Amino acid sequence: VTLAFATSCCLSGVVFGWPALAVALKREGAFSSKCADDDDACKSQEVALARVFTIGVLCMFGARLPVGLALDRLGARVTVVITLLGAAIGALLFAANNYAVGFALITGCANGVHVGSMHLAQLFPGKEGSVTTIFNGAHQMGSLVFLAFLGIYGSGASLPAIFRGYAACLAGFALLHGCVIQPP
């Protein structure tokens, strides 16, 4: 349950941390090619960043049905591992400046981790509500991931390096869930 909680904290609610990530993306110069040299508040850049966020939110909500179908057909272990690997690929794409597709994969796959861990509450008869609430809290804590990234970025790390590290972390979680922890 501790690993599932940590994994959920690292992925399931990240979409809600977008404002901090948008700050880092602006500093990194994402979509700055759409701006004039003398344009401090570039509307085209804002629109492009808002589009990435919108795509991410749509993927987060749109992925719920496919995740549910995967849980029914493949089981929790396979679903969680696949979605963690999908999110890791998304992080690598994000690191390669493919922001929309990367963010879509990260946020779309986040549901698999969150929903795929809920069944663990059944391991604690009489405490199912408490465990489910803990996982929902982990989902909310996921919004702090990009805030942490902004702090790391502010101390000198590049955004691509941060997202490559994030991809490695998610792949490590996939390995742990698939081979060690997650019951079928």
What do the predicted segments below correspond to?
Residues 25, 70, 152-153:
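Hydrophobic alpha-helical transmembrane and interfacial-helix anchor sites in secondary transporters
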Residues 90, 97-113:
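Hydrophobic core of transmembrane alpha-helices in multi-pass small-molecule transporters
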